[in-house]
Swiss-Prot record:
SUPFAM superfamilies (alphabetical): 6-phosphogluconate dehydrogenase C-terminal domain-like, ClpP/crotonase, NAD(P)-binding Rossmann-fold domains
Record-marked site positions (Important for catalytic activity): 119, 139
Keyword entries, A-Z: Fatty acid metabolism, Isomerase, Lipid degradation, Lipid metabolism, Lyase, Multifunctional enzyme, NAD, Oxidoreductase
Single GO cellular component term: fatty acid beta-oxidation multienzyme complex
Location of the region described as Enoyl-CoA hydratase/isomerase in the Swiss-Prot/TrEMBL record: 1-189
CDD domains: crotonase-like (cd06558)
Binding site for NAD(+): 325, 344, 401-403, 408, 430, 454
Pathway this chain belongs to: Lipid metabolism; fatty acid beta-oxidation
Subunit annotation: Heterotetramer of two alpha chains (FadB) and two beta chains (FadA).
Region of interest called 3-hydroxyacyl-CoA dehydrogenase, as start-end residue ranges on this chain: 311-723
A single GO molecular function term of this UniProt record: 3-hydroxybutyryl-CoA epimerase activity
This protein's name: Fatty acid oxidation complex subunit alpha
Amino acid sequence: MIYQADTLQVKEIQDGIAELSFCSPKSVNKLDLATLESLDKALDALTSHQGLKGLMLTSDKDAFIVGADITEFLGLFAKTDAELDQWLQFANSIFNKLEDLPVPTISVLKGHTLGGGCECVLATDMRIGDKTTSIGLPETKLGIMPGFGGCVRLPRVIGADSAMEIITQGKACRADEALKIGLLDAVVETDALYESALQTLTSAINEKIDWQARRKQKTSPLTLSKLESMMSFTMAKGLVAQVAGPHYPAPMTAVITIEEGARFARNEALDIERKYFVKLAKSEEAKALVGLFLNDQYIKGIAKKAAKSASKDTERAAVLGAGIMGGGIAYQSALKGVPVLMKDIAQPSLDLGMTEASKLLNKRLAQGRIDGFKMAGILASITPSLHYAGIENSDVIVEAVVENPKVKATVLSEVESHVGEDTVITSNTSTIPINLLAQSLKRPENFCGMHFFNPVHRMPLVEIIRGEKTSDETINRVVAYAAKMGKSPIVVNDCPGFFVNRVLFPYFGGFSMLLRDGADFTKVDKVMERKFGWPMGPAYLLDVVGIDTAHHAQAVMAEGFPERMGKQGRDAIDALFEANKYGQKNGNGFYSYTIDKKGKPKKTFTEDILPVLADVCADKQEFDEQTIIQRMMIPMINEVVLCLQEGIIATPQEADMALVYGLGFPPFRGGVFRYLDSVGIAEFVEMAKQHADLGAMYHVPQMLIDMAAKGESFYGAQQQGSI
């Protein structure tokens, strides 16, 4: 043994050839701080090892290295610029040491080789993988960019254009693609991988492969003419500006880094990479996006605990109510390996549900994500039925009939009589209280809400709603089932609107009040999209949700929270509803809609909306962008905080993920609680006070007032790794 540490070891495997194996005692290998320090010492040991002829990098896991340890990021980013720069110099000195070994080196890859793992293997002379290999640099998705030499080495290995595509998109390449662009030198069968790598390394040792020329290419400036350079980087900047936009600076910063470093040799180019990495790491966007990743891991951890605590797994499910929503739920369940009975009282609805599932599967088939055999198997695992026969075999029932409390209560009571005592029954509802529906059941402890978002196959969030009598066992089983479906389940307590709709309607309330006071709804949409970062402004979102749906939900919320959400007279939503302008569904709402060549609705502003709004809107008034943002966001933020204060949602992490996954809250802002920490709670309280005369929606919850007085934050030292 040449060197041994907790997460890696080095041994000589045959005359002069050493193997450095990453072998973390955990389930995956990560390039955490401890592993980096061990790698540094291992390379020192190799440098002083007599008779060294070549080095292989291997992993004892199904994945080579999944990346750096993201739990350590926020702690690192909290360092001063100088401290972070110094740490990056140390980290890069390790990979330089690997690259500068006086012998040929090869990385033997299988499974994921991502982020820091990819940057590590770029420092070796050769890379060989099997068909399971996936290699790439996802850092820009976290608001940063490669900082271990990825922006320097990758363009020199595969060319600037391919490198910029991978880095700016945060892309991972499959083995065949990586081979095609030169990121891998060979792809072989898994059984032959180790031996093939050994043979390749031996060929390099025997000078049959010019490994020194490869190394020189990586440590020299990029070979681009002035014209090539101008074309590559100008085009890349244009594409990135179009796709990433101004709220996500990491992709553009990566392009600038590669461009500026192109004319320098390795060490000078690494200095440039380090400078820009520090700038990104200190940004609010990086803090928010890394925080979201950690929050997502937190949600997944809760789901894993639920699955372990549940007395049984969901092996079969049933959906009551077909159509597009029921078909979407059935599709998602079957896709993830849980056969489902889809029951409805009308054959046309069953046909629509099966058509929806078939349409979604055909899309996957066209994208090459499944083959015909797999598609047929998934479709066959959805059983449409007009009867309850066979439903007794289901572990979980999802009721998804029309949003009517009497109809739902009847269906729930009926299905309970057809299933066993340990069958869990759930209701997919967005507005009807779970405690009310539970009254129709003999076993309310086996019942909870399971609120899917539309379209089911795209929206990651599922709200799991706990009623007063819902048992922990029921919650655990439903959370585990939602996770099995590939969703992100978040448990909330029952209240009008649950969590997501409850916090959405004060936002719509703020919008209605802006229109009442003379704001132009098209300007409000532009500000909330372009400046704040929502995927849709409030008027456009209302059109997509459906004005009729919003009108009904608004009435439910007004009844549930009359002080904050009760209305004084008619508003814009009422006016459109009364004019039968329901939004996209009937082609007219705030905007008018036509179908484009791709079959998608295209919105345009037409003046026929103005008379409809005339009696609920004041004469046109100009509002600056900050006022629009404040008047739109303060009501939502206050309601989110009240939900935490009242225990409707358990943690800031779950609230922020629900907002991003369920409403499209701008990811670069990290959710309401991350946003509050970024703005400063005391600053937010003062800002809200300036709008207090607008009504109760703008009155700050006591929790925020108390936290502001104590100088507290929601995340604080949380998610900060110990450095």
